[in-house]
Amino acid sequence: HPLGNPPHLRMESLARTSTYVRAYVAVVVLLAAASIVLLFTMSPSGVTPETVSILGLLAFIGLGFGLQLAELKLVVGTVHSSISFIIYIGSGLVFGPAWAALITALSVGGAQLVGRKPVIKAIFNVAQHVVAIVASGVAYLALGGPLPPQPIDEAVLPFMAFLLVFFAVNSVAVSGVVAISEGRPFKDVWI
């Protein structure tokens, strides 16, 4: 065909890509949901519903929501990211990964809803943020990071792991969905 693939083949490719994107999003959502359930069941942070500060939770949720909604961006090269990650990381250090996951989900989800993002994009954004904050919070705790954090000289390695894992998981999750949706190799879109 002189203009590339015939229209029916392009539509088949688009439908296949869409199916792959939905499957990828479903896996990320399942991972996020399972991690929240496991963390609240195990309560590794020691911050229990009886000891958590409701006012503190609401403050972190409000700040995360506001920054996410304001779309204040951190730009590095061609990559644009909301600065709301600062709030999510802070909530992980104060409340632990279970509560940080809840704060992150409510903040990102609320902003996606108010911003009228497409449903699949909104669901993915919530889930990938939750997976990133859970993985990074668990890495922090596994390396002996205290909650809430003590003087930084006692928690440098756990804190660095928290940051590196958060950005790595976030980058891999977003790059994965972009690679699938655009039909490009992961290495070409990894940010």
Question: Residue ranges of each PLM-predicted region?
Answer:
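Short helix-perturbing small/polar motifs within transmembrane alpha-helices
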Residues: P2-H80, I86-I191
